[in-house]
Amino acid sequence: MQQTAALPKRLSCDRCYAQKLRCPRPSTNDDASCIRCLRQKVQCVYSTALPKGRPRAAVRACAAGAGATAGAPPITTTTTTAAPSSSDTAPPIFSTEDLASLTGLSTSGWLPDPTWEDSFCFLSSQVVPQPPPLDTTPPPRSLSASGLDNPENCVGRLSDLATRLHAVYQTTRALSDHPLITNAAFEAVTTLFNAPLSPPSAATTAATTNLRETFTSSRHLLETISHLLWATPNNNPSTAPAAAADETVIYHFTIACYSLLLLIYATLLTALHRDALTHTQPSLSTTTTTTGPDNNTSTWCSAPSLVELRLVLLFHMITYFLDRLQQMIRMYTAEFEKQASNSTTGRRPPTSGRWSEEVEEMMVVEEPWEREQHIPPPPPPTSSLGSISELETQARAALMQLRMSLVATRGGLVDN
């Protein structure tokens, strides 16, 4: 003990030395405890100073930091000198237990190397994952509005659309021979949503390609009719006869595309109804776990199969397309007949592309779950839509059959 007392003591106590803080002592008190230890009411311990001839702790930390960073001594120097100045005015942030543990570490002679912070600086830019950059490329548009302003381009687009739909319609008879058309239709929907503009791969079947063309053509026809409804009519008297002829051709091409889509959807819905009857009926070997026949818990609570889930998705998607197509065709027909009556009576057509109040009333279409039947009332005899009302009835009847089969299945996949 006498040899240890003879050695010089460190100017700072162990607590202040471990925290790299100043160690102020009261000048009026004979006690050797520093102000910080007195404030925390802990024992103030002064350890033995380092052997003579070695640099002080601050100088040794600067030299070690300069050797570790190899070329960045200003950063290390700034870090070691700025920390004490900012901590002098800050209140103590360590509890009594933390300070006691730090005191024990300082007494044992183990201190953290101040160069560790500089050695692990590379982790901030290499280990922490950064979010990927945002893709600012706008999504491609399937139809160009500027191209549809020209009647010749619009006729060309509708003619190509009718040609593709006619080719698809010729192959729809094979849908009745397909073993499971639900999977092919769902694959067509998946490829349509993933890459709308990419060509089909070699692995896709002919049925998947044709069904994808059906869904794509439905969307293109909706976009074309929407543009035709909002297009400003031609008010030039000199070009009015030619414009009326172009509008007549465009209208008949639109009705032809709509008729082909109705035929294709009617055949597709019939094939889906066959799949629903084959793959969604509950098994006859299912046992009844309750007393009543209406409370077959094992059948009602069983998980739906993948085919059943795909049928529900296809049912709602086809319902949406049929509702939107019928709604847009009704509005476009009303606007076309209004323009035709104005041209025959000599009245000036409206100067804006907005449709009349009668057409706006047609926009209020009830959802499939809000109406009792899916088959709408037939159009009036004077309307030019009388020729396609039978096709709409066939498509709606096939949709109703598929809906009833999904309602009757286990769990009631579609609300009644």
UniProtKB/Swiss-Prot annotation:
Residues 130-141 have a biased composition (Pro residues). It is found in: Membrane; Nucleus. It is a multi-pass membrane protein. This is Transcription factor caaR. The keyword Transcription applies. Residues 13-44 bind DNA. The chain crosses the membrane at residues 249-269, 302-322. It comes from the Eukaryota. GO terms for molecular function: DNA binding; DNA-binding transcription factor activity, RNA polymerase II-specific; zinc ion binding. Transcription factor that positively regulates the expression of the gene cluster that mediates the biosynthesis of the acyltetronic acid derivatives carlosic acid, agglomerin F and carlosic acid methyl ether. Residues 68-90, 130-150 are annotated as: Disordered. SUPFAM superfamilies: Zn2/Cys6 DNA-binding domain. GO terms for cellular component: membrane; nucleus. The keyword Nucleotide-binding does not apply. Keywords: DNA-binding, Membrane, Metal-binding, Nucleus, Transcription, Transcription regulation, Transmembrane, Transmembrane helix, Zinc. One of its GO terms (biological process) is positive regulation of metabolic process.
